[in-house]
Amino acid sequence: MSVNKKVEIRDEFITLSQFLKIVDLVQSGGEAKSFLLSHKTLVNGESEDRRGRKLKRNDHITVDGQEYEIC
């Protein structure tokens, strides 16, 4: 899997909602909920629609074909 963008975190984990805000795909948690229902989002190859999903280092996220890695 080729990763196009790396997202660095300071804490042990971030939520999927926080991730979407960091990469400027949404502005708020409510917007994240709607976004996840209408955009194909994968975490480590599995479909995900929970905005509270914890993302840790080395997780791979794909949003509408754009790939990211948490580091």
Where are these regions (language model features)?
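A basic, amphipathic helix-loop patch mediating RNA/tRNA/ribosome contacts
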Residues: 15-57
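A short, structure-level motif marking secondary-structure boundaries and short turns
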Residues: 1-2, 43
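A detector for short, charged/polar N-terminal pre-domain segments
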Residues: 2-14
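A positively charged, amphipathic N-terminal helix/segment that binds anionic biomolecules
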Residues: 5-6, 60-71
